[in-house]
């Protein structure tokens, strides 16, 4: 599993292009909100992440 962390002010292209490419390659990928709610990007695009940081099990 690949986790892409999203924080307020993230650069949309830098986060979402890799997510798109990984998913096209059938690599399990999830976006993670570090604030527990939809995350506003640097260019005004708000992204609803797949999970919140509290939901991620790294063990």
Question: Language-model segments: what does each one mean?
Answer:
Residues 1-59:
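Extended, subdomain-level signal for the structured scaffold at the beginning of enzyme domains
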């Amino acid at each position: 599993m690949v986790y892409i962390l999203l924080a307020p002010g993230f650069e949309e292209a830098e986060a979402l292009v890799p997510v798109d490419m990984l998913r096209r390659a059938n690599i399990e990928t999830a976006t993670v909100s570090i604030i527990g709610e939809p995350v506003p990007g640097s260019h005004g695009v708000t992204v609803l992440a797949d999970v919140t940081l509290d939901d991620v099990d790294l063990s």
